[in-house]
Regions:
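Short polybasic linear motifs
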Residues: 16
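N-terminal glycine-rich phosphate/pyrophosphate-binding loop and immediately adjacent elements
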Residues: 25-162
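Short amphipathic alpha-helical segments embedded in low-complexity Lys/Glu-rich regions
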Residues: 64-69, 73-78, 132-137, 213-218, ...
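Rossmann-like flavin
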Residues: 102-105, 111-245, 251-257
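Mid-domain catalytic core of redox enzymes
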Residues: 253-255, 264-268, 272-275, 281-408, ...
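C-terminal catalytic lobe of FAD-dependent flavoproteins
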Residues: 378, 388-474
Length: 474
């Protein structure tokens, strides 16, 4: 069934603490705001929530008539319209409203920055989560489970016995490593020692190095090998902390009803703190003063004044540059992905070296157990940073793992990053969503933007064990 949140949200947002309204009952455009946010993607909604909590007067507009922007979840009819034009979906796929298909398929690290942000802002009370069944890696033509326990590690065919002993010594070093306690560093300075040099001290073979970098540290490519090892060690620690958090088969969690719930949760937060929302606002043209600083936004002939503008790249196309493309396949299936222990939610990482690519490919699958499809249906995604224009052949290694599919859709979108100087023009533009299957890069961008906008940093070192609100639903 469709999420209860999606029906209530527009009503809540318009009812809660909205500013003065004009004769048509619309929020007044002729007001001055501290910040106008354009686009209701996840990044923009987190920011409008955080800024509203800070006491800033926020107006949030979107040219679409739905929340989520590029990071929305579509029902079956919307999915069909986007990829197949006017055709109606076949009846055997079930009810349209039972589908919530993510446009940016990502899982959440259970101990990661997005979960910490949700707890910090108390948005957890608007959402329900469930652990993800399994995390797998593609190696030598086969799918292997990424070990989640010592016993699984001992039995795993990913490494031979002697290699397992060497790897265990390395894992113990990582587990004990505390940046603030030099006694745990064993005389190594991980801010200068590269990842390659650190791993070499343990004599691990290339396949293990590949596994550590891509399946545990979740790097997208191999640049990390020549960069300081501290980042990789922190990423490995995040993986193991996330894994330990729910004693599940993976370090990931995922919201019931899909990722479209996340922007809506933060939109509710903003509304509770006095933020104003306007959807279906065509054009949304940013206005600049004589000094080139953003000073307002015009839509339908009315201008709302502001001190700062926050937006996604599509609202200020002359201030961003293209940095790549994401290739993606979306499959509707009637079975779990083969060779994944019948998992109803799963991630498979295909490291670049296994495919002869320059960056990893990701397979992501969820199903009716997370309320994103009717009973018996599974939604699978294959995504990668595009390295060619032939999307079907490029994604073939991932699609081949899926088994028979009921429907298959292909999509490619450009990725952009800002090139402006925010302190000169007061425009704060988010970076497009990448191909990774988790939200760490997403939230890093948001927190950096928050600091640029406010000059403050958010302390996310919350005690997660105290976050009972988040735990109840697991």
């Amino acid at each position: 069934s469709a999420s209860p949140l999606s029906h209530l949200l527009p009503l809540l947002c318009s009812a809660l603490l909205a500013p003065t309204r004009d004769r048509r009952g619309q929020p007044a455009m002729d007001e001055e705001y501290d910040v106008i946010v354009l686009g209701t993607g996840l990044k923009e909604c987190i920011l409008s929530g955080l800024l509203s909590v800070d006491g800033l007067k926020v107006l949030h507009m979107d040219r679409n008539d739905y929340y989520g922007g590029d990071s929305t979840s579509l029902n079956l009819n919307q999915l069909w319209k986007k990829f197949r034009g006017e055709d109606k979906p076949p009846a055997h796929l079930g009810s349209s409203k039972d589908y919530n298909v993510d446009m940016v398929p990502k899982f959440m690290m259970a101990n990661g920055t997005l979960v910490r942000t949700l707890i910090h802002t108390n948005v957890t009370k608007y959402l329900s989560f469930k652990a993800v069944d399994g995390s797998f890696v593609f190696s030598k033509g086969k799918i292997h489970k990424v070990p989640a326990t010592d016993m699984e590690a001992l039995k795993s065919p990913l490494m031979g016995l002697f290699e397992k002993r060497r790897a265990r010594n390395f894992f113990i070093y990582v587990q004990n490593y505390d940046e603030a306690d030099p006694k745990t560093h064993q005389g190594l300075d991980l801010t200068t020692l590269t990842t390659k040099e650190l791993i070499a001290k343990y004599g691990l073979v290339d396949d293990t190095v590949d596994f550590i970098g891509h399946a545990l540290a979740l790097h997208r490519d191999d640049r990390h090998l020549n960069e300081p090892a501290l980042d990789t060690v922190k990423r490995m620690k995040l993986y193991s902390e996330s894994l330990a958090r729910f004693q599940g088969g993976s370090p990931y969690i995922y919201p019931l009803y899909g990722l479209g719930e996340l922007p809506q949760g933060f939109a509710r937060l903003s509304a509770v703190y006095g933020g104003t929302y306007m959807l279906s606002k065509p054009e949304c043209k940013v206005e600049f003063d004589m000094e080139g600083k953003a000073c307002g936004v015009t839509s339908e002939g009315e201008t709302a004044k502001c001190k700062k503008v926050v937006c996604d790249p599509s609202y200020l196309t002359n201030k961003v540059r293209k940095i790549g493309k994401v290739a993606r396949a979306i499959a509707i299936m009637s079975h779990p992905i083969p060779n994944t222990n019948e998992s109803h939610s799963v991630q498979i990482i295909l490291p670049q070296k296994q495919l002869g690519r320059n960056s990893d490919m990701y397979v992501f699958c969820c199903s009716y157990t997370h309320n994103v499809a009717p009973k018996g249906k599974f939604i699978a995604f294959v995504s990668a940073e595009a390295e060619s224009d032939n999307i079907q052949s490029e994604l073939k290694p991932g699609i081949d793992l899926l088994g028979p599919v009921d429907e298959l859709f292909f999509d490619m979108y450009d990725r952009y990053e800002p090139v402006n100087e925010p302190y000169l023009d007061n425009c704060f533009i988010s970076t497009s969503y990448d191909a990774t299957t988790h939200f760490e890069t997403t939230v890093t961008d948001v927190l950096n933007m928050y600091t640029m906008i406010t000059g403050k940093t958010i302390d996310l070192s919350v005690d997660l064990s105290a976050a009972s609100a988040a735990e109840e639903e697991y």
